[in-house]
C-alpha cells in the first residue's frame, strides 16, 4: 500500500515548527545503563589500554556503547575512552582502524567528535585529529556522515 505523498504533513517533522519537542527527538531506549553496570567494562578498558592491547581496547569501547546512559555516566565512560585512545601509539592507529568493522568506526567517530567538544578532549586535540584523519583515509567520509545523521549520542 502506497502512501499519498501529497497528504504528508511535512511541518510535523520540522523541529522549528513548534510541534516537536526535544524529547521527541531522543530515540526510545528500553533500559537505562547505570555507572555500576559500566564500571567493570571501564576497568577492563583501562587494563587493556595500559597493557598495550590497543586493538582490544578500541574494539571494546566501540562495541555496544552506552547510548541509554544518563549524562554523568556517559561522561565518566568517555574519560575511560579518552584514556584508551591517547595511549595508542601513532604508528598503531592505522592498523587498529583497519581491524574495526564499519559500525565500530562509526562509534569511534562519535567519540572523537565528543572529545573535540569537551575541555578534557580538547587538550588531546592532536591525538583525536590523528584518529579522525586515519579513519577518513580508511573509510572515507562515511563514518562522519553517519555521525551527523545518527541521533544516538555517546
UniProtKB/Swiss-Prot annotation:
Instruction: Fetch the Gene3D superfamilies from UniProt.
Output: Actin-related protein 2/3 complex subunit 5 (1.25.40.190)
Query: Looking at the UniProt record for this protein, which Gene Ontology cellular component terms does it annotate, in alphabetical order?
Result: actin cortical patch; actin cytoskeleton; Arp2/3 protein complex; cytoplasm
Does the entry feature the keyword Kinase, yes or no?
A: no
What are the GO BP annotations of this UniProt entry? Answer: actin cortical patch organization; actin nucleation; Arp2/3 complex-mediated actin nucleation; mitochondrion inheritance; regulation of actin filament polymerization
Enumerate the subcellular locations listed in this protein's record, separating them with semicolons.
Cytoplasm, Cytoskeleton, Actin patch
Q: Domain of life, per the record?
A: Eukaryota
| Keywords linked to the UniProt accession | Cytoplasm, Cytoskeleton, Phosphoprotein
Q: Which residues carry this modification: Phosphothreonine?
A: 142
Checking SUPFAM superfamilies in the record gives: Arp2/3 complex 16 kDa subunit ARPC5
For molecular function, the Gene Ontology terms on record are: actin filament binding; mRNA binding; protein-macromolecule adaptor activity
Other comment: Present with 3060 molecules/cell in log phase SD medium.
Q: What does this protein do?
A: Functions as a component of the Arp2/3 complex which is involved in regulation of actin polymerization and together with an activating nucleation-promoting factor (NPF) mediates the formation of branched actin networks.
Give the record's family classification.
Answer: Belongs to the ARPC5 family.
Q: How does it assemble?
A: Component of the Arp2/3 complex composed of ARP2, ARP3, ARC40/p41-ARC, ARC35/p34-ARC, ARC18/p21-ARC, ARC19/p20-ARC and ARC16/p16-ARC.
By what name is this protein known?
Answer: Actin-related protein 2/3 complex subunit 5
What organism is listed for this UniProt entry?
Answer: Saccharomyces cerevisiae (strain ATCC 204508 / S288c)
